[in-house]
Amino acid sequence: MYPTGQQISFQTTPLNVQDPTRMMNLDQSSPVARNETQNGGGIAHAEFAMFNSKRLESDLEAMGNKIKQHEDNLKFLKSQKNKMDEAIVDLQVHMSKLNSSPTPRSENSDNSLQGEDINAQILRHENSAAGVLSLVETLHGAQASQLMLTKGVVGVVAKLGKVNDENLSQILSNYLGTRSMLAVVCRNYESVTALEAYDNHGNIDINAGLHCLGSSIGREIGDSFDAICLENLRPYVGQHIADDLQRRLDLLKPKLPNGECPPGFLGFAVNMIQIDPAYLLCVTSYGYGLRETLFYNLFSRLQVYKTRADMISALPCISDGAVSLDGGIIRKTGIFNLGNRDEVNVRFAKPTASRTMDNYSEAEKKMKELKWKKEKTLEDIKREQVLREHAVFNFGKKKEEFVRCLAQSSCTNQPMNTPR
């Protein structure tokens, strides 16, 4: 190709190699490069704005649901409050009619005699704790309950309930026995310990408690006795019969295998006791009354039947004992009380006071309960209103943040003008 021996010379031209950093700066300063950079950054910013807007939108939806929940709660509470207002008005009308009744509200002589009869039955047991307490009450009246020793004493079992039917009263008294009928009922354990003290050797200190009180009135407690502590009893925690002023327990009636109620079933003993309205609520610090505590523990679900034959026929349905008006007694499942027995001479009183008086007392108790529930509902309404207002405020702040996010996203997505 080339002549042999001919020397070829190459003239080298130096290359102009520029600094990469300078090239980058130069490229970025150019209009085209600047436009490309801005477009790439805009895409990333738009994606972030979209993610942020979706997050804010989700937060707004959750906060809106929270506001609706508070509004639903307020609607329910206000409807409950309106129902209570109507019930209070109806009860006020009922009480007005009772108050204008020609039958006096004060206790009549029959009721007084009934109380004296029960007190006399207890006083016959001279050497009992119940006898001492009843004698102190007879001698000192209302002042007896102000003694430090007796402040926590609710009373004697026999005097804390009444039974409409004399025969049933005797049957229930026989079921419980004299010891339980004369038991001393106390509100709490401190009241129980106040009844009796002991020396260093574990012997009863006759100079303290009920023994000292008995000595002061010429009585000596020679028999052992039961003291029932209400706050230590396991109370009934189920429902009560609706709109029942005596707050009877809503117990399931016994059913035979065919689904029918046994013939002759009259009810549960615990619900056949009439209780003074003052003892239906808040006898214990937990708000329970005597029916849920004392009488539920004495009778549990004791069933009452018309005859012994009815009771025996219902054996498959009896779980906590049963009694019949003709004297039949089943203590527990499988334990029958047979043979002749001496009748307990301390019975529940028969309520012979004016029904008008009883109804008025029950209405007063119901009115007190309704007003208490209304106050609690009003407090719940105020609390729910505060929570709703707080939720609405937070929703407004979040909405402002969402609007700002949308505005920024709109600015980012505007088309850029490419220079010509």
From Swiss-Prot:
Record's keyword terms, sorted: Coiled coil, Nucleus, RNA-mediated gene silencing
Primary subcellular site in the record, as a coarse category: nucleus
GO biological process: gene silencing by siRNA-directed DNA methylation; regulatory ncRNA-mediated gene silencing
Record-level Gene Ontology MF annotations: protein homodimerization activity
Superkingdom of origin: Eukaryota
Record has Coiled coil as a keyword: yes
Keyword check for Coiled coil: yes
Subcellular location, record wording: Nucleus
Any GO CC annotation of this UniProt entry: RNA polymerase V complex
Role description: Component of the RNA-directed DNA methylation (RdDM) machinery, probably by facilitating an RNAi-mediated epigenetic modification involving secondary siRNAs and spreading of DNA methylation, thus leading to gene silencing. Involved in the assembly of RNA polymerase V (Pol V) transcription initiation or elongation complexes at the chromatin, as a component of the DDR complex. Required for de novo DNA methylation.
Quaternary context: Homodimer. Part of the chromatin-remodeling complex (DDR complex) that contains at least DRD1, DMS3 and RDM1. Interacts with CPL1. The DDR complex recruits/activates the RNA polymerases V and acts during siRNA-directed DNA methylation (RdDM). Interacts with SUVH2. Binds to DMS11 and stimulates its ATPase activity.
Protein name as it appears in the record: Protein DEFECTIVE IN MERISTEM SILENCING 3
Native organism: Arabidopsis thaliana
